[in-house]
Structures are given as structure tokens and as C-alpha cells.
A protein has these predicted regions:
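Gram-negative bacterial Sec-dependent N-terminal signal peptides
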Residues: 1-6
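Outer-membrane beta-barrel porins/channels
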Residues: 9, 39-41, 56, 68-72, ...
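Transmembrane beta-strand segments of Gram-negative outer membrane beta-barrel proteins
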Residues: 17-39
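Long, well-ordered hydrophobic secondary-structure segments characteristic of membrane-embedded
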Residues: 34, 51-65, 72-74
Length: 484
């Protein structure tokens, strides 16, 4: 049974076990994952189950062309994500209460408005201050009576300190009130913009792999293999709710794109004692993807950012380079008694160097972080590499029936984690059974239960926005094989 659930975006585990089967061999299978992942946002609201069920098929064909040369074609879906929030929480749009800006950002807007009001006041002449004070009292300065009152008040302003203080205080208060109204309008407009979005936060990522493997056995029991990998990737993300602040309403659609990479490895086998050992390296694969991005209206409402956001929105988007990670698989198997084998798999995936920063998202993040250096941030990234271990025992019960039990552990890819996949690693326990109606055919099935690691969920800027605990998943797998 394939991995089904793992750190970051890992899914299939990228096994090449089918290629190391003796003779000619074909298999096809499917895995189904039913996760239950829920938590609370920082306001104490329940998120409900945000993890979507998904299934992914796999297939493999291995041909023993000569005694020393073999060829394999493997299909799998190595990476992916499927998640969506619903209900009433900070990851779902609320058309009444959503706020586009953090309390700190709102404070900055009001402070900036008041600073501008103070600067304008400081540059006013005595005549302008007196005129502003009288107009605030309803005096019409275009009339003769108004001009007389203006002259008398200006004389008093210039010759009486108490009157000067009184007028200055009133004019500055009026300027601050006007500035506060303007700042409030900015905040209100930003809130209106994000409240126009609908639905909950969602993410979907799909990949497909075709591996073309050529093997050479230069000496008995040893196989060297290498080949090319063709991969496609597509996906989309929608950010909704207060948790995402100015990015509430952001959408990105990644069109399907293709890339190529390679794999290489070596295997050592002694069939007489059911011994197998193999190590496989898979390269990273670059994808230059076209991305459609929308939803920057909240930040545009801030006067200091309007021009920059308009320029970003109007400019053609650069292609997004997505690099799926390199990995290493170590597979071990050995007979430990008659009709009984022990097996283990160790997998490393280089998630620490993986990130996604769409062009416009990245530019907007640089504008949003201008006050702190303007370095911006990624839409998705991970802080650690993934390590996973699966080990178990299989036993042939009769000529037609066999079974196995296994236990697994996954390190996760760091904590805090993205709100789009808020778990950190797992432990699992699995059982499987295989029925062979003929020596050349079999049907195998299995089930695994996952205890998912607790995690704090953060948004792209690094702010923790939720806590996810006591989650689990169950996976099912079915596979059929044929030797010919």
C-alpha cells in the first residue's frame, strides 16, 4: 500500500519496488485517504474538518528484456493537496465582521493621517489659521461683516497668547478630526473590498509522474538503474477570512505545466533468502508555470500603497518557477524465517528548499512589508526536510494467502505549518492481505490508521492563526498484479 499521507505535499512515496520484481511484471492500484483535520482559530472558533478526501492511482510495467537489461514504466501522483475551510471561523469570509487590516496596520494609518494633519497645520500662516477657525464657526468671510470679524480676530490672535492658543487648539483639533475621518474611510474601504469575497480558504494541487527506468545487471544479484521522469503539476489556492488580513480575497490559478527530471539507483538481491536492498535518488524538477492572480484590493485602499498596487496589477505576470523536491528512498527486505520477511523503507524529501511565491503575490508582499525592509514572503514554504520510516513483517500463510503488519513514522516538514496543511508528521499502523488465485496473479488490499501530529498554523507572513490537535486519518489501498 502506498504512503497516502505524509509531510508537506508528499503523497505516493515514489516507490520503485515494482521495477525490482523478477521477470515481466505489471501492477495497478489505487489508494484512498480519508483525513479528519480540525482545530481552532485564534478567536476560539472551530474550523471543522478542513482536509478533503482524495484518491490517487498508480501503475507499473516492468519488462525483463534480456538476462542483464530491464525496462520499467511507472506512473504515480507523487505530490498533492486538497483542503477547504467552511463554517464560521477566521478562514472563511464573513461579509459583516471581516477586517482587511490588522490592529497595528490600522493604527499606522491613523497615526500617518494625524502626522500629515500636524504637518499641514505647522505650515499654516496666522491668516490661514484664523480663517479656518472662523469658517468652522460658520462665519462667511466673503461678506463685509465677515471681513471685519476676520480683521479683529487676527489682531487678537497676534497680540493675545490665550486667544492664539485657543484658535490653534481648535484648528488643530479640526485638522485631526478630518484626518481621522479620512483614515476611517480608508479602513472602511479596505474592509468593504475584502468582504466582497465569498467562500472559504481552499487549496488543490495535483501532480502526475511517468518514470522511464532502464536497468543493467553487470554482475549477479546487482542491478544499476537510471532513467528520465516526466512530471505535470497544476493547482489553485483561494485565501479567505480574517486570518489572511490584506490577502483575504486572493486567488491564484496555476495552469498545468510540465517538467522533466531524472532518477538513479542501485539494488542488491538474493532471491533465495528473500533479501532485497535498494537506494533510489530522484532529482528535483523545475516547472515554469503560468499563474492567474487576483484579489489585491484591500492593500490598494492604503494611500501609500495605491500606486504600487495599481502598477503591479497592470503589469504582465512573470512565470512562476515551481521546483518539486529531490528525494532519496532506501528500501530493505530480508527473510527472517520460513515464509516470513521483514521490510523497511526510509525516505528523505528536501522540503526545506521548496517554496511557492507567485509573481504578483510576492511583489504585493514586498509593498506590505516595506516598513520592515520590504523582503516580502512566500505563499507556501517549509522549514524542515521530511524524514519518514515504515517497517513491518509479512508472512505467507498458505500458497494463496499472505498478510503483513507495519508501523510508520513521519517527521513532518516543520512547525508552525501552513494553514493549507496544518499537521506535523504522524505515526501510523497498517495491516494488509494478499490473495493469489494463481502463481502469476494476485490481489492485495490494506488499511492504515494515522495519528497526525499537532501543529500551529501560520499564514505567509509568519503570524500564527490557528491550533490543530488530536487529528487522524485512515487510508485504504487496493492493488492487482500479474507476472508474465
Amino acid at each position: 500500500m502506498t504512503v497516502a499521507f505524509a509531510a508537506a505535499l508528499d503523497r505516493s512515496g515514489q516507490s520503485i519496488a515494482a521495477f525490482l520484481q523478477p521477470g515481466n511484471y505489471f501492477e495497478a492500484g489505487i489508494s484512498v485517504l480519508d483525513p479528519d483535520v480540525s482545530g481552532k482559530d485564534t478567536s476560539g472558533n472551530n474550523t471543522g474538518d478542513m482536509a478533503g478526501d482524495y484518491y490517487f492511482p498508480g501503475a507499473a510495467l516492468k519488462l525483463q528484456l534480456t538476462d542483464k537489461i530491464s525496462f520499467g514504466l511507472l506512473y504515480d501522483q507523487p505530490f498533492g493537496a486538497d483542503a477547504g475551510y467552511s463554517g464560521k471561523n477566521n478562514f472563511v469570509t464573513n461579509s459583516v465582521t471581516d477586517r482587511a487590516l490588522t490592529a497595528g496596520q490600522e493604527t499606522e494609518i491613523f497615526a500617518g493621517a494625524q502626522a500629515r494633519a500636524q504637518a499641514i497645520f505647522n505650515n499654516l500662516t496666522a491668516q490661514e489659521r484664523v480663517g479656518a477657525a472662523l469658517r468652522a464657526q460658520g462665519v462667511d468671510l466673503s461678506t463685509q461683516a465677515g471681513q471685519v470679524q476676520f480683521a479683529n480676530t487676527l489682531n487678537a490672535y497676534n497680540n493675545s497668547a490665550p486667544i492664539k492658543t485657543q484658535i490653534d487648539t481648535a484648528v488643530l483639533a479640526g485638522a485631526n478630526a478630518q484626518a481621522n475621518n479620512q483614515a476611517q474611510n480608508i479602513v472602511n474601504q479596505a474592509n468593504t473590498n475584502v468582504r466582497a469575497a465569498t467562500g472559504g480558504t481552499q487549496v488543490e494541487v495535483d501532480t502526475q509522474n511517468l518514470s522511464f527506468i532502464f536497468g543493467l545487471s553487470p554482475i549477479k544479484n546487482v542491478t544499476l538503474y537510471a532513467g528520465g521522469v516526466y512530471q505535470t503539476i497544476e493547482g489553485g489556492v483561494s485565501l479567505r477570512g480574517n486570518a489572511y488580513s490584506i490577502y483575504n480575497g486572493y486567488d491564484a490559478k496555476i495552469k498545468e505545466t510540465k517538467g522533466t527530471g531524472w532518477l538513479a539507483g542501485a539494488a542488491y538481491q538474493i532471491p533465495e533468502i528473500a533479501l532485497k536492498a535498494s537506494v533510489t535518488y530522484r532529482s528535483e524538477i523545475d516547472h515554469d508555470a503560468n499563474v492567474t492572480e487576483t484579489g489585491f484590493s484591500a492593500l490598494r485602499a492604503i494611500p501609500t500603497a495605491t500606486a504600487a498596487i495599481d502598477a503591479i496589477a497592470a503589469a504582465p505576470a512573470e512565470k512562476l518557477t515551481i521546483t518539486t523536491p529531490q528525494s532519496v528512498n532506501l528500501d530493505l527486505q530480508s527473510g527472517i524465517m520460513a515464509d516470513t520477511v521483514a521490510f523497511a523503507n526510509i525516505r528523505w524529501v528536501n522540503w526545506k528548499d521548496f517554496s511557492i511565491r507567485p509573481d504578483k503575490f510576492g511583489q504585493v508582499s514586498e509593498v506590505a512589508t516595506a516598513a520592515s525592509g520590504g523582503n516580502g514572503f512566500n505563499l507556501i514554504n517549509y522549514t524542515d526536510d521530511q524524514w519518514s520510516v515504515n517497517a513491518g513483517v509479512g508472512r505467507k500463510v498458505t500458497d494463496k494467502w499472505a498478510g503483513n503488519v507495519s508501523v510508520g513514522w513521519d517527521s513532518g516538514a516543520g512547525n508552525p505549518v501552513s494553514t493549507l496543511g496544518p499537521t506535523e508528521g504522524y505515526w501510523n499502523l497498517g495491516v494488509g492481505v494478499q490473495y493469489s488465485p494463481t502463481p502469476a496473479t494476485f490481489i492485495a488490499g490494506g488499511v492504515k490508521y494515522f495519528w497526525l501530529g499537532d501543529a500551529d498554523a501560520n499564514v505567509s507572513s509568519g503570524t500564527v492563526v490557528g491550533e490543530f490537535e488530536d487529528n487522524n486519518a485512515i487510508a485504504y489501498g487496493l492493488k492487482m498484479g500479474y507476472r508474465f
